[in-house]
């Protein structure tokens, strides 16, 4: 049986009303080691929902199930990344007041062994900014579920295989 706890109980986020994933498996449960934790950041709940729905709970049959942690603020992203346990972060490049591209660059510069980061952008022409942001991959809105799941799976496979997340 899976033990459940709130995100706040895991010590990642203060209970300040941000919509995070309502519950996540407890660290002590054996199923946690098999799950992949994906942090999804956007100030807009509908963008977070679009990202999680496009990826689905299992982006590929050869990968473990995905457990999403949704956050709406930069402080929440920083707290989660500092706490560890995040296998992949997906950041909204259009988030306000701090966008995912600048946040990606900050995380890559400041965190040793930073987990892979995917940046979601609104315009295909903005993909070049991912190079500056040091993102490992880019998703373009509107999200195609096949492309989104494949991109996430490719990044996770590279990191699980001991290869750099960027191809």
What are these model-predicted stretches?
Residues 35-56, 89:
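Conserved acidic segment of CheY-like receiver
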Residues 89, 138-139:
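Two-component signal transduction core modules
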């Amino acid at each position: 049986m899976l033990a459940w706890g709130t995100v706040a109980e895991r010590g990642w986020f203060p209970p300040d009303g941000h919509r995070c994933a309502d519950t996540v498996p407890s660290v002590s449960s054996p199923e946690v080691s098999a799950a992949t934790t994906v942090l999804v950041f956007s100030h807009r709940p509908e963008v977070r929902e679009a990202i999680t729905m496009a990826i689905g709970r299992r982006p590929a049959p050869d990968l473990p199930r995905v457990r999403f942690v949704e956050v709406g603020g930069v402080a929440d992203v920083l707290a989660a990344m500092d706490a560890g346990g995040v296998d992949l972060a997906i950041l909204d490049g259009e988030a306000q007041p701090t966008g995912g591209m600048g946040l990606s660059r900050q995380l890559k510069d400041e965190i040793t062994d930073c987990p892979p980061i995917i940046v979601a952008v609104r315009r295909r022409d903005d993909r070049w900014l991912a190079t500056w942001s040091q993102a490992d991959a880019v998703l373009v809105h509107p999200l195609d579920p096949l492309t989104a799941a494949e991109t996430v799976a490719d990044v996770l496979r590279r990191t699980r295989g001991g290869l750099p997340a960027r191809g």
